[in-house]
Amino acid sequence: MEMQRLPVEVITYILSFLPIADRKEASLVNHTWYFAAQDSLRQENILYNIPATSSSLATIESLARRRVSCVSLTSLDSSTVSRDVIQAVSCHLGPHLQSLCLRGSSLTETSFMHLLLACPCLSSLDLSGCNSLFMSGTLLSKPETIGQAQRALTNLQELNLASLRYLSDLSFNRLTGCAPRLARLSLARCHLTFGFDPYRGSSNYNSSALLSFRNLLRFLKERASSFRALDLSGTSITSPAMRSLVQVEGLCLQELVLQNCRDLSNEAISLLCTHQPHLTALDLTGCSELSDQAALAVSAGLRALQSLCLGKLQRLTDRGFLGIAELRSLQRLDLSECSLVSGSELVKVCSAPELRPNLASLSFAFCCLLRDSSVLSLARSLSPSLRVLDLSSCVSITNVSIQAIASHLPRLTVLRLAWCKELTDWGLLGIEERNHHREKDAGPQFSRNFGNMGFFLPPLQNLEQDPKVLSDSASNESRKQHRASLQALEQLQELDLMACSKLTDCSITKVIRFPALRRLSLSLLPELTDASLVAVARGCQSLERLSMSHCGKLTDKGFIEAASSLRRLQHLVISGCSQLTGQTLEAISRECRQLKSLDVSMCHGISMADIALFQAQLPLQTCVQSRFVGGADLSFTL
């Protein structure tokens, strides 16, 4: 059967196995493939970002034919252009929209109501940072507008009101009162008042001057049976307030985000785990008063937990993970910036197949106590499930870790190793480095103990020295196994090697060949030359984001040769590359037609005239950062 005669439904099913970028390319084959690709994209609920510019009007009409359901409008204000964009969205996209994001917009109440009433199928609405809407306090103050809003928001399930400095009890009640099916709410970084009763015992919570926790409790009591997710990040919620919240009768939360709630205590978290045992996602990042006791309470009380974020807890140690084996459903664990965590307890749990969780995402970013031995053990244990691994700024890990990752984690899609300065070309290539330093300096040396001056031979640093982490047999088996190069991670979609300053062309040109790679950072690698740039471009032709800032040896010749292989590139950062000139911009504008943002800051060889010419050749939505270019301190938005 000829491919063009296949039913659209069959082609749609085939395309569903491809990445989004590949589906976009497939849509250019013919009309049938175009409609099939649009169907598959619509099923993924792809979010379309639409800036408030005159050039967006034609785009909106085009999106209407695709019946898109998720839209984010940016840079809206009271200008005529913004009103035209709102009118176009209301007319062409409104009837089909299910998700609408207006984050940070400065639109008027009239424009908002006009847009809202044109979207009767909304299930998600993001008004975070839209302070102009709430400044006057008159939003939804008229009976007729309330009735219209109720009809428009009858299916709304998710509402984001984060970072609204003028949100009050009155405006909160008006807005949530129009959404009877609301199940998810964000009040992150709002000025909630805790600890006192501004109403002095009255139950008439309608202040136009403040947003009170008592009013939030009233709302939760009314919606307890259907409410599922709450975000109070960046608020001053106290332990007594947490007690009142988790004990609301009938409330069964599934997700709770409490980032940077610095007044929460271990006791508050214990109460949370006791009264909300059905939580599947908990984020306690930056709750600085929490310690091991809180982590132990989570392990003991939240057996259904799938996502746990404990980043930036400076009091958390490995002891807090003694009970982590109880979290059998855990899929995501974030321990970034926990400076006292080495991962030893997690290693013990993961070493036992009957105890280890099926972790898909693990972050040890900025955990300076993490060692190669722990990485090796975790890589072996989590091989079947792990897809995302973040070891950024784990300054103690070496080539042993990268070779363990390449050998045992072939299904990784995201790997972040930024600022791991001990990584070398040998590690990426999977070759054992000859220790010339040891052979040269193997003679006697002074001991470090000045109280017992003498001579000794420095002991060899073997992984077998830590029996808690890796047994002798396991270590020997690993050493006998053929070392894999980084190229073994064939499914990588994101790779960050920023500031791994010992890496050179020797490894980059040979191993950075990933057909599915979409994001790559090679910034602050001073030894990289045009050879690496060309090799990366040819080996990673699906790249959408590339960062090579402060790679001082890159020249125009490299970009002229590489640009034709980077046709899908959308974001490029080459700031601080001092040898680049306008020829690089000419090559990029000619070949990288999908580019959305470019950073050429501190590229002294590029002039403002070059940028003006680049502006004329690329689509208007491209943003160019050009600080300190040609001696100027300017930032162009084209």
Model regions and ranges:
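N-terminal adaptor-interaction module of cullin-RING ubiquitin ligase components
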Residues: 1-248, 253-260, 265, 269-273, ...
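Acidic, serine/threonine- and proline-enriched intrinsically disordered linkers and terminal tails
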Residues: 193-210, 430-489
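Inter-repeat linker/turn residues at the boundaries of leucine-rich repeats
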Residues: 31, 66, 95, 117-120, ...
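Short loop/beta submotifs within extracellular cysteine-rich repeat domains
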Residues: 167, 182-184, 193-194, 238, ...
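Conserved positional slot within leucine-rich repeat
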Residues: 72-75, 101, 126, 160, ...
